[in-house]
Amino acid sequence: MRRQTVLVILAPMAAVDRQQPRAAMASLDEAVAGVWAVAALGRLAESGTLARLGAGDGRLDDPVELADARLLAAYGLLEADAHGYRVPAGSALTADASAGVAREHLLQAIAHTRGQPPGWQSGDRAILHAQGRASTRLAGVIEDDLLPRMPEARDALSAGRGRLLDVGVGVAALSIALAERFPGIHIVGLDVLPAALEIARTQVAVAEMRERIELRLQSVAAITDEDAFDLAWVPQTFIARDELEAGLARVWTAVRPGGWIILALAGDSDGGRVDAYHALLATILGGGPMGVQEGTELLERHCHSSLICSEALHPQPLLLAQRRP
């Protein structure tokens, strides 16, 4: 007896009550794709391939690297051309910064899934190193975007006689990067996390900058320096709100007339995905979300001056700057 082949077509389930789960799964797929894009960025950066693409050599022979590049191109982080892939013109996607950002966020995300408590208290050396590596890009932001608007601080740092206060110095990566850009300046770095300062001391010694970078186990609210600094860097994201409230007045006193405070804000969420992510990260790190209006009010409240010079100077991190007259 001849058998008949029966073709069964499985039609999409069109029931209304199935649409919501489908939409949720699609959103989850997009979120997971973003995680893997960060991982792909880190892999290409760590291997040296990203630097090679940035230098104009777009050939990729390894199938995994090719898949990494395709994913990054889908997110606009790379561009495809006839010769392979390239870093978009004008991109801040340097290999070292990309590696640091990727490693930092992936490690923090894993720690978050394991229930790590919020606040600047993690002693995880890998996370601390990654955060430091990611922070070095801010040295370029300070030199290229901020200091041109701060003539007194710019002149002091450029002349090699400036003094800088780095609140939340961490592993001293930003301090070292700034000391390299401005030979001769002196930096005081504060932190309340002994594990971070232990790494920082090693990093400063390796960089041969122990005479130029002073590290203190000290809260920003406990500093007693007066008229001592041309520039102060205060990352709100890492500082608990009560400590920040108490510390800003002390920083204002520590900055000399004509000096500047840079307040780096986490931003606040308007319901968008990226803003919601920044708010989550800021909550995890201990400072919580803070936008321009709240940051400006904070400066006005604690930096006692009739001349307020606060303005949003940079999109992310969101930076406010105020000059002491």
Regions found by a protein language model. Give the residues of each.
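Short alpha-helix
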Residues: 287-303
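Short, glycine-/aromatic-enriched active-site segment of Class I SAM-dependent methyltransferases
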Residues: 268-286
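Conserved Class I S-adenosyl-L-methionine-dependent methyltransferase catalytic core
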Residues: 74-161
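Conserved SAM/SAH-binding beta-strand->alpha-helix loop
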Residues: 193
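A short glycine-rich, Lys/Arg-flanked "PGG" loop and its adjoining helix->strand segment in the class I
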Residues: 245-257
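Conserved beta-strand signature within the Rossmann-like core of class I S-adenosyl-L-methionine
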Residues: 258-266
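A short SAM/SAH-binding and catalytic strip from SAM-dependent methyltransferases
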Residues: 230-244
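A short acidic, Gly/Pro-enriched loop at the edge of an enzyme's catalytic core
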Residues: 221-232
